[in-house]
Amino acid sequence: MNTTVSNQTPRIRIFDTTLRDGEQSPGCSMTPQQKLVMARALDELGVDIIETGFPASSHSDREAVAMMGRELRRPTLAVLSRCLQADIETSAKALETAANPRLHVFLSTSPLHREHKLRMSREQVLESVHRHVTLARGYVDDVEFSAEDATRTEEDFLAEVTRVAIAAGATTINLPDTVGFTTPEEIRGMFSRLIASVEGADKVIFSAHCHNDLGLAVANSLAAIEGGARQVECTINGIGERAGNCALEEITMALKVRGAFYNIDSAINTPRIVSTSQLLQRLVGMPVQRNKAVVGGNAFAHESGIHQHGMLRHRGTYEIMRPEDVGWESSQMVLGRHSGRAAVEQRLRALGYLLEEEEVKLVFEQFKALCEKQRVVTDADLQALMQDATVQEGYRLASMTISDVGSRANALVELSDPEGNRVAETAQGNGPVDALFGALASATGVKLELDSYQVHSVGIGADARGEASLSVRHDGVEYEGTGTSKDIIEASALAWLDVANRLLRQRERGVVAGKTAAVA
């Protein structure tokens, strides 16, 4: 099938909201340093706009935005803000370091939200949109306005809101399917009619932001493009609130593979898709399912004999894109004690990590120390080192002792808390892991309900390390964590702390972040 497009192919803008909407997915919070690591990868991936966070919600988000602004000079950096003067002022200040700043302001427009959430009339909504978009435009030249719950808004009112936002200075109009309610035919028509009828529509970019509650986020985003949208808001691996968002890897590869049909492309550097996906999985502890399109472990696997026979004859029989087009590799580079710093840095770059000079130095020292304990260092080992290097906040394991007490196990753990103080606790359990988790719960004050726990090896042969993976619940919300060590009990402790620290960071951010709109 011909997938080529002409040299004059129009380009879609990719607005990545992994660090804002994606991070609102339960259990997916990141430290400012982790956000910076992810933002570097998104920059290398070629996204046009990176939504960095919601500065009014926490100091952590403000710090992350400032860090990204000082370092990333190519992409547009956007921050989310409610239609509140204080929010907009805080967001504008957070963007002071950015080379290409964008203020993204939003307000609900649907009758359901107007009546029950905002308690505002149509006229009050229009006045608020005009006042706050005007205020935002006074700080930056690039202002995006989102009509939250647009797909459940009366179309005549949505047109009026859009007209007012454009007149007030908005440069991008986002029409979110906030609860994943619409269908491709409906959203295509909505975009087409509004772009054709609203005064000033030809002077702005229209954007789609689709949620996946009915599994239609990518299909709806493609339909919005057919209707005239020229920006798509998406996340790596489709993470996000509830069932998630439009997946960046799926929408961009759909446009690339079906280029002759859509006649529109993106600037995404597709061979970096898999490494970026895997980087996010490690940072937030949320693996993708094996049959996930594009980035899942089975995306290019063929077990059927008929399929294998066809692939041997011609790979195009059962593959519509090449694994290497999205960054899958057929071989793994193995590093060891004779490997130099340049080789380690190159491999980390291939895995999606872009590091400063001091960060490379620190990780290389850890790499050399690891080489003293084992012959070879694999990709999984490097990813584990990076996970340790980027998690700078929260409790750290200082020491632990496991012993038998009759038929039960006793665990003594000593942790270093976020302020550098030491805290020690003991607990008994039916086995070493049960006792360990009890002691960790006492030391941190975090109670987790264990759903599943497994340990497997990473690395090669006798040098392999144990990776513990666990799934837990806290207040009814599921979290996943991973930890890696030569000692599987220590790996289990690190996996437990991975979840606990993420949960504690969410608590510190407070309830404001939870109220940020689903705006998206």
Curated annotation (Swiss-Prot):
<dbReference type="InterPro" id="IPR000891">
    <property type="entry name" value="PYR_CT"/>
</dbReference>
<dbReference type="InterPro" id="IPR013785">
    <property type="entry name" value="Aldolase_TIM"/>
</dbReference>
<keyword id="KW-0100">Branched-chain amino acid biosynthesis</keyword>
<comment type="function">
    <text>Catalyzes the condensation of the acetyl group of acetyl-CoA with 3-methyl-2-oxobutanoate (2-ketoisovalerate) to form 3-carboxy-3-hydroxy-4-methylpentanoate (2-isopropylmalate).</text>
</comment>
<dbReference type="InterPro" id="IPR054691">
    <property type="entry name" value="LeuA/HCS_post-cat"/>
</dbReference>
<dbReference type="Pfam" id="PF22617">
    <property type="entry name" value="HCS_D2"/>
</dbReference>
<keyword id="KW-0464">Manganese</keyword>
<dbReference type="Pfam" id="PF00682">
    <property type="entry name" value="HMGL-like"/>
</dbReference>
<dbReference type="GO" id="GO:0003852">
    <property type="term" value="F:2-isopropylmalate synthase activity"/>
</dbReference>
<dbReference type="GO" id="GO:0003985">
    <property type="term" value="F:acetyl-CoA C-acetyltransferase activity"/>
</dbReference>
<comment type="subunit">
    <text>Homodimer.</text>
</comment>
<dbReference type="InterPro" id="IPR013709">
    <property type="entry name" value="2-isopropylmalate_synth_dimer"/>
</dbReference>
<feature type="binding site">
    <location>
        <position position="21"/>
    </location>
    <ligand>
        <name>Mn(2+)</name>
    </ligand>
</feature>
<dbReference type="GO" id="GO:0030145">
    <property type="term" value="F:manganese ion binding"/>
</dbReference>
<dbReference type="Pfam" id="PF08502">
    <property type="entry name" value="LeuA_dimer"/>
</dbReference>
<feature type="domain" description="Pyruvate carboxyltransferase">
    <location>
        <begin position="12"/>
        <end position="274"/>
    </location>
</feature>
<comment type="similarity">
    <text>Belongs to the alpha-IPM synthase/homocitrate synthase family. LeuA type 1 subfamily.</text>
</comment>
<feature type="binding site">
    <location>
        <position position="209"/>
    </location>
    <ligand>
        <name>Mn(2+)</name>
    </ligand>
</feature>
<keyword id="KW-0479">Metal-binding</keyword>
<dbReference type="GO" id="GO:0009098">
    <property type="term" value="P:L-leucine biosynthetic process"/>
</dbReference>
<keyword id="KW-0028">Amino-acid biosynthesis</keyword>
<keyword id="KW-0432">Leucine biosynthesis</keyword>
<keyword id="KW-0963">Cytoplasm</keyword>
<dbReference type="InterPro" id="IPR005671">
    <property type="entry name" value="LeuA_bact_synth"/>
</dbReference>
<feature type="binding site">
    <location>
        <position position="245"/>
    </location>
    <ligand>
        <name>Mn(2+)</name>
    </ligand>
</feature>
<comment type="pathway">
    <text>Amino-acid biosynthesis; L-leucine biosynthesis; L-leucine from 3-methyl-2-oxobutanoate: step 1/4.</text>
</comment>
<dbReference type="GO" id="GO:0005829">
    <property type="term" value="C:cytosol"/>
</dbReference>
<feature type="region of interest" description="Regulatory domain">
    <location>
        <begin position="396"/>
        <end position="520"/>
    </location>
</feature>
<keyword id="KW-0808">Transferase</keyword>
<dbReference type="InterPro" id="IPR002034">
    <property type="entry name" value="AIPM/Hcit_synth_CS"/>
</dbReference>
<dbReference type="InterPro" id="IPR050073">
    <property type="entry name" value="2-IPM_HCS-like"/>
</dbReference>
<protein>
    <recommendedName>
        <fullName>2-isopropylmalate synthase</fullName>
        <ecNumber>2.3.3.13</ecNumber>
    </recommendedName>
</protein>
<dbReference type="InterPro" id="IPR036230">
    <property type="entry name" value="LeuA_allosteric_dom_sf"/>
</dbReference>
<feature type="binding site">
    <location>
        <position position="211"/>
    </location>
    <ligand>
        <name>Mn(2+)</name>
    </ligand>
</feature>
